[in-house]
Amino acid sequence: MVGSDGDGDGGGGEAHAPAAPAHHHRRPPRPRGGSGAIVEGFAAALRRRIRSGAAAAARASFGGDSGDEAASGEPSSSSSSSPSRRRGGDSNGAEASSAAGGGGGRGGGGDFSAFTFRAAAPVHRKAKESPLSSDAIFKQSHAGLFNLCIVVLVAVNSRLIIENLMKYGLLIRAGFWFNDKSLRDWPLLMCCLSLPAFPLGAFAVEKLAFNNVITDAVATCLHIFLSTTEIVYPVLVILKCDSAVLSGFLLIFIACIVWLKLVSFAHTNHDIRQLTMGGKKVDNELSTVDMDNLQPPTLGNLIYFMMAPTLCYQPSYPRTSCVRKGWLIRQIILYLIFTGLQGFIIEQYINPIVVNSQHPLKGGLLNAVETVLKLSLPNVYLWLCMFYAFFHLWLSILAEILRFGDREFYKDWWNAKTIDEYWRKWNMPVHKWVVRHIYFPCMRNGISKEVAVLISFLVSAVLHEICVAVPCRILKFWAFLGIMLQIPLIVLTAYLKSKFRDTMVGNMIFWFFFCIYGQPMCLLLYYHDVMNRIEKAR
């Protein structure tokens, strides 16, 4: 078992040396005879190590190809010590391969290397599919290709940004956001500051109702009057004043949020009264509801609800133990960065494309398709930045300041396989409000599921149209139609999901209609309609 390179030390020492396993490499004895012998000895040891490593690699390669666990799972010395696990099958074959290999078992793997590197060794051992064939493509890991796509995406977009800056320069203008017209928007600011009067009025109505001063019917009528006035009042102010589009959008957006909160406040307290007051109390319903959430409203609860990042009222919310100041500062910095990035995308890419485009319904078809596709890429980036800045950063900032515990503001909507799944995941505050105050009440009143979904989308479409049409001061129903057309897409993607199980066809349809076609088309339509209105006014 001891190698012949150690003969210079004498046979006596080797005769009594214990036999070492073939797969363990011992340091070769120091040869005698000067520096030349030393170099020759170490060269021989190096050759043995290289031959052993090559044999092990070959064994792993051939074992993986053939599916032979014995060939791929153990070193060659182990296989040579057990005839039943050796490819040759007997000791004669091992001796022959050892002799042919020149080093027979020394360093482990001599017998296998002699067999592996012979021309007679079989290479094709079983039928196998190509990794990208239809039968094997989903069994492979494509992480490397995904990384390649990320690298290509970063490289291509970096080149486009550099090319755009070299050709057009930096197009950011302060006048695009704030101009002399913005200084005349003080009526909108005063209107915004007066909106808290409506929640205070709703609180007074609930106090009267809980004290049995007014009936439930009167309280309901007063809530309807307050909520309707709250949404009509900002609309009239925006239409009366010649305000900037951005200022009008901010006001009507805040007004819609307050309206949703008022509806939730009135509906929830009405339900609490039904459960806790008079003979309408139902024991089995109370047993399933936390009693802490069945208390009359207080002014502190109302103020917290109006500021909290939620649209659904309840007397108490899960709270965190403290405010993480360092984390909060980092989130604020990120929010400012992504807000600035949105402004850069709008002014550097979207605004020039829209200004130099034609009305999509009046120009040629190819021209409209080219403009929509040109606008789709910056629109996707803008939409993703908007989502991250608002739903992840801004709502988390509010939640951290108020120690609001439930921070599930969105789910993994980007993996949605149907349009219905997307709407249930991308905007959780609105989704919870719709389910709680529209969908389930419709179901409890005997309305079918399909009609309840239609009513939910109808309310959403009206609110979207108000948020866009009022600041632009045009009524074209583009936003309304964009939301209502989601219903046939829901049916289509649900059918595709049932027909092609566990596929991403519905996900591709979602990305196409939302980011490639839908949003750029709506943006072009509203921009040109606003420009036409301004030209007619002049």
Swiss-Prot record:
User: Where does motif FYXDWWN motif map?
Assistant: 409-415
Q: Where is the composition biased (Low complexity)?
A: 69-83
Keyword Endoplasmic reticulum on this protein? yes
Return the annotated region ranges for Disordered.
Answer: 1-39, 54-106
Spell out the catalytic residues.
464
Catalytic activity entry: an acyl-CoA + a 1,2-diacyl-sn-glycerol = a triacyl-sn-glycerol + CoA
- Residues passing through the membrane, by range: 136-156, 186-206, 218-238, 245-265, 293-313, 326-346, 382-402, 451-471, 474-494, 505-525
Biological process GO annotation list?
glycerol metabolic process; triglyceride biosynthetic process
**Main enzyme class:** transferase
Q: What is its EC number?
A: 2.3.1.20
GO MF annotation list = diacylglycerol O-acyltransferase activity
Primary location class: endoplasmic reticulum
Q: Which GO terms describe its cellular component?
A: chloroplast envelope; endoplasmic reticulum membrane
Which pathway does the UniProt entry assign to this protein? Glycerolipid metabolism; triacylglycerol biosynthesis
* UniProt keyword terms in alphabetical order: Acyltransferase, Endoplasmic reticulum, Glycerol metabolism, Lipid biosynthesis, Lipid metabolism, Membrane, Transferase, Transmembrane, Transmembrane helix
Function text:
Involved in triacylglycerol (TAG) synthesis. Catalyzes the acylation of the sn-3 hydroxy group of sn-1,2-diacylglycerol using acyl-CoA.
- PANTHER family, per database record: DIACYLGLYCEROL O-ACYLTRANSFERASE 1-1, STEROL O-ACYLTRANSFERASE
Query: What family does the entry list?
Result: Belongs to the membrane-bound acyltransferase family. Sterol o-acyltransferase subfamily.
Protein name (record): Diacylglycerol O-acyltransferase 1-1
Organism in which the protein naturally occurs? Oryza sativa subsp. japonica (Rice)
Taxonomically, what lineage is the organism?
A: Eukaryota, Viridiplantae, Streptophyta, Embryophyta, Tracheophyta
